[in-house]
């Protein structure tokens, strides 16, 4: 079977995290997967922000109401700029996010 399809079928949502640091090499692989995502007219309207700081993650919990952010060793924020492409920026950001989720 196609390797990509296998990864898609075996993807899991993780809600409990270990208190173990994630290697920068692994983080870079995840970010690279996001950078390789397709986007409308190659506009790449995204920016990825890696958050490791516990205090900032706690502020993100308050802002998003997602408690699991505080327990995760890192969070990767996907920011999309509607000024780059007003019609497709949300979809482009979602595709980049999916690439990173599959790489993780």
Where do the PLM segments sit?
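Glycine/small-residue-rich phosphate/adenosyl-binding loop
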Residues: 28-32, 36-96
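Short, intrinsically disordered, charge-balanced linker/junction segments flanking boundaries
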Residues: 100-104
